[in-house]
């Protein structure tokens, strides 16, 4: 949950205040079925974290308690933590199931760009194949964006035009339904990509 870290810090800080001591907290890192553990083991004082490991990375933390300023607090970027959680979730899922490669659709849009970025971070760009499935509704700009993204990420691509499938399906539907609405034709492209 997005606010889990803040709730955890508050609970540990309250415990540290009650104990009048610094609390050492240890948490596992990685995915386990549908759960993703962020790690973030460290020392917590009554005002929050004093020092902790980065989230979603297996590592150790050496603490010089004599030099520790107990008034310092650790701040993190929420967006970076979400990205790290998604990356480790995908990486651990693949590792635990023995998967080494992924195939995903590249449309040139933001959704497929984010999925491709996370997959490349998680399992390596060389292990992610981006498939472009253009039809008459695919603009040159979208195709160019998808290819540019793949090149920048270092992932291979394959283009499989679906225009012939689209035309045949549209004609079959028009025989029984009459002329299709433009939005129906655009949605037909998306449905064909899912086949």
Task: Give residue ranges: language-model regions.
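Short acidic, glycine/serine/threonine-rich loops at helix termini
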Residues: 2-6, 34-39, 113-118, 132, ...
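Catalytic P-loop NTP-binding/switch module of NTPases
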Residues: 51, 58-85
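A conserved beta-strand->alpha-helix junction
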Residues: 57-64, 127-132, 136, 140-184, ...
């Amino acid at each position: 949950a997005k606010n889990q870290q803040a709730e955890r810090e508050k609970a540990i800080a309250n415990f540290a205040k009650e104990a009048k001591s610094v609390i050492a907290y240890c948490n596992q890192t990685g995915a386990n079925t549908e759960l993703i553990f962020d790690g973030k083991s460290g020392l917590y004082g009554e005002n929050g974290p004093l020092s902790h490991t980065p989230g979603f990375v297996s590592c150790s933390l050496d603490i010089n308690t004599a030099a520790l300023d107990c008034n310092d607090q650790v701040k993190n970027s929420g967006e970076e933590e979400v990205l790290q959680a998604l990356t480790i979730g995908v990486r651990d899922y693949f590792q635990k199931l023995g998967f080494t490669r992924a195939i995903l659709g590249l449309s040139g849009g933001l959704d497929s760009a984010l999925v491709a970025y996370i997959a490349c971070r998680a399992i390596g760009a060389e292990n992610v194949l981006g498939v472009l499935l253009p039809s008459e509704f695919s603009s040159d700009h979208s195709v160019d964006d998808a290819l540019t993204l793949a090149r920048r990420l270092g992932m291979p691509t394959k283009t499989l035009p679906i225009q012939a499938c689209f035309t045949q399906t549209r004609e079959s539907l028009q025989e029984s339904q009459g002329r299709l609405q433009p939005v129906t034709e655009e949605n037909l492209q998306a449905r064909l990509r899912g086949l």
